[in-house]
Amino acid sequence: MQLDSSIAAIVTGGASGLGEATARRLASHGVRVALFDLDEARGTRVAGDIGGLFCKTDVTSEASVADALKAARSRHGIERIAVNCAGIAPGKRIVLKNRETGALAPQDLASFSKVVSVNLIGTFNVLAQSAAGMAGLEPLDEDGSRGVIVNTASVAAEDGQVGQAAYAASKGAVKALTLPAARDLSQYGIRVVAILPGIFHTPMFDSIAEDFRKTLAAAVPFPQRLGRPDEYAHLVEFICRNGMLNGETIRLDGAIRMAPR
C-alpha cells in the first residue's frame, strides 16, 4: 500500500504515546488521519498539529466507535488503515494481603474485567467495525488489497510478570486474535498484523524517577535503552507498505525477555 493523501486511517489511543507517534508518521506521508481517544485536550491538539480529526471515543462501546467511524468517514472517506493503540496497564496481584491485618483477598473481578474490556474487547470492537467498512472498498491493486489492521499486543503476552495477570491475559488474547482474524478477513483483502512492543518511553514514564528508567533500560540487551514511540510508528508504516505481512505477530523489544518481576 502506498501512503499518500488518497489513504485514510484511524488510530485509537492516538492522543499520546505509540498512537500519537503513529498518527504523526502517517500524516507526514499525506495520509488523512482520525484519532480515536478519550483525552479530548491532547487529542484535539495532536489532530490540529497534523491536520487530522479528533473523535472522542470509548473503544469498549459499540455505539461510540460507530459514531467515531461515521464522523471520520464523513470527513476522510472509509479508512484503509486501522491501528489499535488504545489500552490500559494497571498492575494488581491475584491474591492481595492486607498489610495491617494480614487478611488475604482475591483480586476483584471488576478490575480484571476492565483491563480485558479495554485491551481485548476494545481492540476487537474497532477491528470488526473497521473491517466491515474496508470490505466494501474497491481493491487497491491486482492482489485485491483493501486495507490493513494493526493491533497492539505486548511482550507481556509471552513474558507476563507478577501483577500482570489481567494485562498479560488481555494482550495474549490480542496476539491470539491475529491469525484467525487475518484468515477470516482474507476473503476481503484485509490484512491483520499485531505488534508486541517491549519497554517504550511513553507519557506514563514521565513520572518515573530517572534512576528507575535507567534500570529498565539496562535490562534491554540492545539497544540498551527504552524504545522510542516513533520506532513503533516506523514498524506500522512498514507493515502498511509490505503487502505480504499478514497474520503475523512481531516483537519490537530490543531482544528483552521480561523477568518474573
Residue ranges with predicted function:
Residues 127, 170:
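Active-site helix of classical SDR
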Residues 154:
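Residue(s) in the substrate-gating loop at a strand-loop-helix junction
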Residues 186-191, 245-248:
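Short, small/polar-rich loop/turn modules that mediate ligand/substrate recognition or access, typified
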Residues 228-252, 257:
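C-terminal substrate-recognition "lid" of short-chain dehydrogenase/reductases
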Residues 89-113, 132, 136-142, 163-166, ...:
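Conserved mid-core segment of classical short-chain dehydrogenase/reductases
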Residues 2-33:
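Canonical Rossmann dinucleotide-binding motif of NAD(H)/NADP(H)-dependent dehydrogenases/reductases
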Residues 132, 182-184:
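Alpha-helical segment proximal to the catalytic Tyr-Lys
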